[in-house]
Amino acid sequence: MKTTLKYLLTATAASLVMTVSAYAAGPEIVKGPSKDAQCFKPLTAETKFFQWPKKEGPYRIALANGFIGNTWRIQMIQTAKAYAALPEVKAKLKEFKVVSTGDDVAAQIAAVDNFINSGYDAIVVNAQNPTAFKPVIKRANAAGVILVAFDNTLDTDEAINVNVDQKGLGELWGNWLVKNVPGNKGKLLEVRGVTGTSVDRDRHEGIQEVLKKSGGNWETVEVVGRWDDGTAQKVVADAIAVHKRFDGVSVQGGSTGTVRAMIDAKHPFVPVGGETENGFRKLCSQYSKEGLKCTSAGTGPAQVAVAIKTAIAALEGEVVPQSISLPLSVVEDPDFKDGDSFYSKETDNFFVGNSFPTCGINFTAQEIMGQSKADQ
């Protein structure tokens, strides 16, 4: 009896070690597509597919956010909590933790390391720096932890990235200005995002490449709006005070504040390429006939829900793309419609298009705003 029991314990321990070792080796590269191919759409035809060994739930999942000082990030945190609270998702979660560390890259990496060391099963991250996480990815793989980056993703093919085509978004804004600013020339104001992030870099590159390829005579004045209405309104007001007149504007975020700065300064309305803030779209509709010709494009904060959904699918042993491509939400003048592309009765500080129907993710403003923005 003792011999049999010893054998069973030894066999069980060996099996457990083999399972942990297999998981800790990181994902296996396999053939696609994913089971949920509509949601988990690969970025390109060359995107590889990952598969981890199936892990029994319920799971401990953490959101390691960096910068928190704007509406998009606050709404993202609220959306993450709303998604985790859905009955079908909540049933799969033992714990859902949220922490925001600010602009400090080292602090964000330390938070991720803390989650790894604390035994979390997966971590989703909106990265403050696209290149600083390579050692963290290795530590996550060694510990059997799945790392999913979204929005500000990572310059790597060794972790899962979930995002829209951020460079393509910059190209869209650039093409709007080339198309709508007369004469293929002029002075443009580019309101950038948070310095050092992949989103700011990629959107900027997209805009500038389009302007260069247009063959036009463009002068660009850059200011840093940090994707925040208050900050953008101040730096745009300062730019107008110095330069007096711009022929077109692109703004990565803080679009409502940017237009309000133009109104306050009595700057003539010009073509603007901006994000998907409800307040921005209200203004685009209100002042369209006075010359405010807008394209409003971006990605809703609900991409955090897609990142969590991806992490759970990977933990359940499903095949997922290394890089998942999400669609953009785009509305252009003259197609701004109340109750459809913007909501006049809702706050300005709300990002419209905050849904991904192909992933079964569609939140109302009330569902999101009912959640807190605090760490949990």
Where do the model's predicted regions map?
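Conserved, well-structured beta-alpha core segment at the onset of a catalytic domain
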Residues: 2-3, 19, 301
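Bacterial N-terminal signal peptides that target proteins for export
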Residues: 1-9
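Bacterial N-terminal signal peptides
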Residues: 10-19
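A residue-level marker of the well-folded mature domains of exported/periplasmic proteins
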Residues: 23-376
